Amino acid sequence: MRNSIKTIKYLVLLANIYAVASHAEIQLSGNITQGGMVVGTTTPDNVVMLNERKLKVSKEGSFVFGFPWNDSTEYTLTIIDANGNKEQSSFKPIPRQYKQSNIKGIAKKIMNPNPANVARSAQDRKQTVAARKVDSDYNYFAQGFEAPRQSKVTGVYGSQRLFNSVLKSTHYGVDYRGQVGAKVQAPASGIVTLWVPDMFYSGGTLIIDHGHGINSTFLHLSKSYVKVGDVVHKKDIIAEVGKSGRATGPHLDWRVNWFDVRLDPQLVLDLPPIKQ
């Protein structure tokens, strides 16, 4: 096990863990960078800790973790085998530079919502927060992701968004061009945990659970072909592009979370499926 962890430490220092450890104890794939996701496999009865947080390990030995967009935390990954032997490796996410974009034409009622809409958006948030807390045993996240649309990317993760020249938010998704009614496919298999057709800010909002806290959110949809509880498979047609909610035109906003940690979907797409 010691040689395996030494290999992991070497890979971590390179910041990108695309190669996997040559030993069978643990394999990792991912990006040690802000917004990155790391998927690993290990012996199923090993305990995996990220700092003080115990990570779920599936019966196949899969586990996953990720980093916020502005993360500067020092992390320690700890592997404890069935005999109590412990190995550790420390690392820190590599910082990134993000773009800034100015979005014009945002309606006054969106920029300065009235009390009723503030209350409505708070209720919307409760629903999305609850859906993103789901900690299922599925390991669909380890099977690789594909883009939900094969169209031009018009907005990227981490960009600082100015609405009518006023700095308002950070964009946590990736935007794809598409006309109203254009098809959206599931980027990975999972279970539908939320569908609301008319949230105040995000409009038609769909969330799919991929397991272990990894979930996809699709915003501004005009239609969903699936409902809560449905099982979907990678590349299934699940919805249609729209311009609902706070959108100045039709497009798909796709987001990926690890619980409440917002990940970069384009980095997630870089991860190959993990052999199990």
Regions found by a protein language model. Name each.
Residues 4-16:
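Sec-dependent signal peptide recognition
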Residues 19-21:
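N-terminal signal peptide c-region/cleavage motif recognized by signal peptidases
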Residues 24-97:
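Cationic-aromatic interfacial patches
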Residues 90-202:
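Surface-exposed, glycine-biased beta-strand/turn segments
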Residues 177, 183-187, 218-219, 229-232, ...:
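Small beta-strand-rich domains/subdomains or short beta-sheet motifs embedded
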Residues 183-194, 225-241:
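Short, well-structured beta-strand-loop connectors
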Residues 187-222, 250, 255:
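Zn2+-dependent peptidoglycan hydrolase active-site motif and core
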Residues 230-250, 254-276:
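Extended, charge-rich intrinsically disordered regulatory tails
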